[in-house]
């Protein structure tokens, strides 16, 4: 089931809003590619944090 801005894994609750939105985008793409949720969540988390760091550097 795809994740939305209102329905996403508990582990994403503490991400910044833009990080969480990116994690949802990445996670949904991984699910569409056939990744199971238990693998898609940590991959999407890591990639979203990396994306945020690269796009919001001071």
Predicted regions and their residues:
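C-terminal alpha-helical interaction appendages
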Residues: 1-58
